[in-house]
Amino acid sequence: MKLQGVRALVVGMRKSGVASAEFLARRGAVVSATDLKPLDELPGVGELGIPFAVQTPAVFEGYDLIVPSPDVPYDLPPLEEARRHGVRVIGEVELAAPFLKGRTIGITGSNGKTTTTSLTGHILREAGVPVQVGGNIGLPVTAMVESSRDDGWNVLELSSFQLETIHEFRAHIGLALNVTQNHLDRHHTFENYAAIKGRLFETQQAGDYAVLNAEDPVCVAYAARTRATVQWFSSRKKVDPGATLCGNKLVLFGKLLMEAGEIPIRGRHNIENVLAAAIAASRAGVEHAAIAAAVRSFRAVEHRLEFVRKLNGVDFYNDSKATSVDATLKALDAFPGGLWVILGGKDKGLDYAALREPLTEKARAALLIGAAAGKIAEQIAGAVPLVDAKTLDGAVRHAFAHAAPGDTVLLAPACASFDQFKSYEHRGETFKQIVNGLEPKD
């Protein structure tokens, strides 16, 4: 892709947008930037030394290339108008792809992406394989280009917001963990959301690998949409070729990998994450023994079923990354019962009724916070006692005051965080600060 002299506009100046602007400028593009926020509310943007304007429809005129950040809707009217006039509109992943050296593992799914991406990178790193991890976590892809190596691997977490803007980006190993309702406030329908996730496999070529969940009907359907060799994983049935859970044993391509009890992160969904990561690592050239050793040394990713503290016999777990109903269901499945579950935040257009049965079985109460509290209360009423806690601090303190030894306070909100927090990380950090500030009960 030739960028020298190209008139480029970057839309949305958070982390990804800043990285895209820097990347374009280094390659000789004539770069401008825009955002809904004014310049003084955008850290680091003023230091870029490029023209900036607060976003209006007129700002989008006169460019050869427009790069919207992942948080900018692809169907934004000025972007649609630009495409109608032949302007190339691509995301940061597509922008970086032609310049990225080495081979790429692309990991998507509604839940488990960050854990599986981190685990895959950890396995490769522990095995001595040159690797860097980024995308939707850590480094933006454009920031990975300079450090990429011809003999290395780039392990990328890819969200639907990123996949929405790819056209030619190719993952040598593509991986879909699951596809369940999420981001319907952005993508409008589940069918559209699922189709966007599937773009990861449509750009693959013969000789690539598509690693798919044999238990997920959407993932199964992706197999017909790719030219890659399909590899399956399942925690419930035997699959071939691929990885499966047989009793308590993880089997990879017909050979014992490890015992399920050796996996240091809790939950059946994390067994599936390990199976998927093991296939990817194996196809990247890592032997069984090295994969198993790396899995044993892996530690839970922050804000993903993260143990925080035990106080007066009560455990506290931070799963702030559980921003969808399905993610919360997986979190509930990881515990036997005695749960005080904190739910709520910014609604993403999801149906919370699926939480009713597991809450009835496992929860002492649901503590509701944030903008979605009313909707959640309506949809799970009668399933479990409800507490209108309003704030995270109120929820934690109420749960601890009423919890008995052996109980667990679980933050698994099933919602986005942006009503009360800057991000799910901010929400998780706040939860941990509150929990670590609790005094023992008399």
Swiss-Prot record:
Any single GO BP term: regulation of cell shape
Record bears the keyword Nucleotide-binding: yes
Keywords, alphabetical: ATP-binding, Cell cycle, Cell division, Cell shape, Cell wall biogenesis/degradation, Cytoplasm, Ligase, Nucleotide-binding, Peptidoglycan synthesis
GO molecular function: ATP binding; UDP-N-acetylmuramoylalanine-D-glutamate ligase activity
Residues the record lists as binding ATP: G109, S110, N111, G112, K113, T114, T115
Transmembrane segments: none
Pfam families named among the record's database cross-references: Mur_ligase_C, Mur_ligase_M
Location of this chain's protein in the cell: Cytoplasm
Entry superkingdom: Bacteria
Catalytic activity: UDP-N-acetyl-alpha-D-muramoyl-L-alanine + D-glutamate + ATP = UDP-N-acetyl-alpha-D-muramoyl-L-alanyl-D-glutamate + ADP + phosphate + H(+)
Enzyme kind, highest EC tier: ligase
Pathway per the UniProt entry: Cell wall biogenesis; peptidoglycan biosynthesis
One cellular component (GO) term of this entry: cytoplasm
Broad class of where this protein is predominantly found: cytoplasm
EC number annotated for this UniProt entry: 6.3.2.9
UniProt similarity note: Belongs to the MurCDEF family.
The protein's role, per its UniProt record: Cell wall formation. Catalyzes the addition of glutamate to the nucleotide precursor UDP-N-acetylmuramoyl-L-alanine (UMA).
Name of this protein: UDP-N-acetylmuramoylalanine--D-glutamate ligase
Species name: Solibacter usitatus (strain Ellin6076)
Lineage: Bacteria, Pseudomonadati, Acidobacteriota, Terriglobia, Bryobacterales
